[in-house]
Amino acid sequence: MSSIQSEHFMKVLFALLDETFDNIHGFYLDRNASLFETLVNITADEASIPVGGKCATLAAQVKHVAFHLDYIEKYFRDPNPPQADWGGIWRTVNRVTPEEWQSIQSELRTNYNRILNLFKTAPAWSSEDEIGIAIAVVVHTAYHLGEIRQALCILRS
């Protein structure tokens, strides 16, 4: 099996990241279905409703993605980052005000931009861990985007 050239990997990685977060390219999402396109139409009240009564709120889903991006950046720079409290967000993010909801979305945007910059300036994709981390950002975010979009179907029905 031949290896892929890093520029091909990078081109596809950035296209998938862009589609997942911002602009549809036709890889896997329908029009107007990226994460930020989805979030722009969610109110703080909607973001505060736990779907199914015991499940996470949309605000917690978004805060978790922002937290994940922050942690991934730290891990990419140092494979031994401090221990993360992965359950903290699910336990603490519930009802949000419009200002808090906007702040969570801004945090997500900031962390996403930091990940983009990190990936763009990475000197070489020389390890499977680095490639795995990059792919995990797309996959993990796509999973939560699906959770958010499914929750919206329930909340708005």
Regions found by a protein language model. Give the residues of each.
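Acidic/histidine-rich alpha-helical segments that form the ligand environment
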Residues: 91-125, 132-137, 141
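Short, contiguous alpha-helical
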Residues: 3-39, 45-89, 125-157
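N-terminal capping/interface segment
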Residues: 1-2, 105
